[in-house]
């Protein structure tokens, strides 16, 4: 599953999807059981404009860790990929956005974003091999 992070959390669409995905398998017992009978690996990919240090300072990791914990509880295993300091706009000149260093954003997009995309691809390959 994937979502951009807006205002510190995943989009409403992703939250709604996850609630509908998870709820039918919940068991309210002391063991935190699940009605999902198989074990599958799940992945969560988040993109955000915040830099890594900003993400940590604002506590994004805590809320995202809860989602990973619930996915692990229900489906067996989960991992997250956090992609930070991404583009918010294709053209920064069209928006009031003077807090961003556009040259740094462009450099990061050119140098780091392809690596993040490769990490996401590699995650998918690992999952396919495990499930295969």
Q: What kind of feature is each model-predicted range?
A:
Residues 1-70:
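Helix-loop-strand module that forms the ligand-binding subsite of alpha/beta enzymes
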Residues 67-132:
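Glycine-rich phosphate/pyrophosphate-binding loop and the adjoining helix
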């Amino acid at each position: 599953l994937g979502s951009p992070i807006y205002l510190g959390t995943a989009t409403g669409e992703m939250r709604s999807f996850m609630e509908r995905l998870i709820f039918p398998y919940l068991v309210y017992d002391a063991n935190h059981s699940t009605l999902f009978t198989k074990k599958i690996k799940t992945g969560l990919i988040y993109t955000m404009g915040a830099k890594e240090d900003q993400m940590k300072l604002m506590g994004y990791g805590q809320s995202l860790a809860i989602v990973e914990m619930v996915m692990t509880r229900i489906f067996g295993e989960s991992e997250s990929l956090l992609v930070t300091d991404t583009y918010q706009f294709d053209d920064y000149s069209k928006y009031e956005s003077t807090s961003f260093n556009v040259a740094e954003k462009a450099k990061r997009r050119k140098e780091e974003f392809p690596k993040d995309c490769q990490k996401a691809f590699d995650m998918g390959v690992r999952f396919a091999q495990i499930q295969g």
